[in-house]
């Protein structure tokens, strides 16, 4: 089934009906990737990429969060840990948030809203996808094993792009 989904998305991409977001794909897919060095600030913390921000949520130590927020690309992705998975607990500054909660989704949407508002390159790339479906076929689908699933990621971007937030 997953193979059929991939094939379907590849066909949509090839006929210009979709964008498969991936760091190694051509514009705008690469700029929309969480790994891309798009900077933004949230709650006074400078982030070198959305990936840095997302990976920082896995650490309770605030100084470690700031350190990881300053990373982008593979360096940010490689800072990951799976420790949070056993409790489904993530952290932002002094807050403790359950990964499967509405509070988590609200927090992530707030970060993407800040990102969209502050980063012109990201915003322009996202707006250039109007009328297309967004996919991230290499993304993980199990919310218990990833900080952000393919569906969550693409839904948030679609809401931002289409002004449904």
Language model: regions and residue ranges:
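Charged, low-complexity intrinsically disordered segments
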Residues: 3-165
């Amino acid at each position: 089934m997953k193979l059929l989904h991939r094939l379907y998305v590849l066909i949509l991409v090839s006929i210009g009906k979709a964008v498969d977001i991936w760091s190694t794909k051509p514009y705008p897919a690469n700029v929309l990737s969480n790994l891309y060095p798009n900077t933004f600030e949230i709650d006074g913390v400078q982030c070198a990429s959305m990936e840095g921000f997302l990976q920082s949520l896995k650490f309770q130590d605030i100084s470690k969060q700031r350190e990881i927020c300053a990373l982008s690309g593979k360096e940010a992705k490689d800072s990951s840990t799976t420790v949070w998975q056993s409790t489904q607990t993530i952290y932002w500054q002094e807050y403790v948030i359950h990964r499967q909660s509405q509070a988590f989704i609200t927090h992530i949407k707030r970060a993407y809203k800040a990102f969209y508002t502050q980063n012109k390159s990201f915003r322009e790339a996202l707006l250039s996808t109007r009328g297309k479906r967004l996919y991230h076929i290499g993304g993980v689908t199990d919310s218990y094993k990833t900080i952000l699933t393919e569906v969550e990621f693409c839904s948030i971007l679609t809401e931002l792009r289409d002004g449904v937030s």
